[in-house]
Amino acid sequence: MESQSSEEWQLEEGIPQVDDPFIQQYMRGRSSLILEEQKQRHDCNLTKALPPTAARACNIVSKIRDQELHQLSSSLGLDDARFPEAMSLDWDSVQKTKLWRIVKAMPKGSLLHAPLHAMINADFLIDVAFTTPGMCVSATQPLISQCDLDEKAFAFQYSSAASKDVADRPTVWSSAYEPSSLVPLRKAASSFPYGGETGFREWLRSRCIPQPGRASYHNRAMPLVNSLLSYEPILRACLRHVFARLRSDGIRYVEFRTTFTFPYRREGEDIPEQGHSDWCHVFQEELARFQGTLEGQGFYGARIIWACPRSLSKKDIVENMKDCILAKYDYPDTICGFDMIVDKDDQNSLTDLVPILFWFRKECSAEGLDISFCFHAGESLRTGGDQGLFDAILLGARRICGGLTLSQHPLLVELIKEKKILIECSPLSDEMHGLTDGIQTHPLPVLLSRGVSVSLGTDAPGLLGEPIDLTRQFWQAVQGIDSMGLTGLAMMVENSIRWSCYQDQPSAEWLSDLREGILGEGTKASRLQEWYADFEKFCQWVTEEFAETEGEEQD
């Protein structure tokens, strides 16, 4: 008996054929359903509006991504190298890839999530501290045990008495040390019990960078670094360093978060200033100086989101808020937002702080000031770690930093879309902090698929003390998320520009600018127009530089 062909067998059994009208109707319905689902994605409209050159560039980037992933998988003997752990990546090798070159060259708009203490290279900061005259150190207790060295408070402060004879004064490593007394930096370093100055530098560096398996980076690093940034010469040097690095990464505007819990001192002054208005003055001076340089051309500016630790007492929080209002009054162009940050496990929740936050808003209104809320919320996956999302939305936050648990709340997802709230997301940093296992377990792809507006930021330096720039965040997103391409990155850059606080705006004007986007007439519209012009030039470069990839067949 002759074997039947597949088609003959199917006809004999009465199996419908693909060309049958009702099967074709099913396929049309299927295609419509897929298209309808894709309309929910964050980059749907941008994908449809891409000019031909940009569409070609997107196709080339996707091919290069797939080729390099295939090569990496083969070399590592893996089925899929899409999800390497950030801490184990050979970044030197990554930076030699075509995909890295492309992402590095991409214009990146604004950086909206940027803790100032995490933006500074650890080795640079330590060198500046050692070369600044009069620097002293102090601790709240003697630092004797390894636990003391790892966790206890340690800070810097200028003192004109640092050069005087203090040979008999116990250092912080001695049980005889008097808590909070100042010890000259070089004396403390040379007497460090684990290797003198070299060991001290290594220890100090370890306090300034994330450590594998430990999620307490900000608790350890933020107070230490901010104590250094509270002295004028070091603040100026670090701002120059950070502005230059950001501009070289394709960033044209930044909003730093920083805390103001240490008294600020001018150069050579033992007595601190009242408040932090002079800090803001230095910030504006250094920004203007950088913008006047050749490398600062095209840098739109920088502003500050005043970050208040939730661990402070409510009375101290109110005093911190008063300091913020005064600084905003004196230097309105510097302060653009207010955040309540998580710095310890035992702290006030946003719910606990609602009365104080209403008081803050009333005081701002009375002074004619506009300081928008940009809250950390939903950044912990532990039970109860998502409750701040409800408060952030109800309090009218324009942006939410974190949002790791947002995807678990369908109603909040819809509210955030309706109220046009941006989520500031830092997948690589979240992995560094131990909040997620990697890009494959990060909620970013889910948020994007549901049409939530997201921008990428950076929340921690790398393990070697170098700041994690946006290029790394972009590279991880495009190589680690299957549905992410150049269009997805471009949409997140557009979001970063649309949600930038270039200038103070009342709510109605803010929402109007968000709705109008590139078609508006204000600052944001012009910045979007400039970015799209830069993006088209970038896409043209991609099509010319990697033209051979366009005609290659996928393996």
Residue ranges and their predicted role:
Residues 2-422, 426-555:
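Metal-cofactor-binding active-site regions of metalloenzymes
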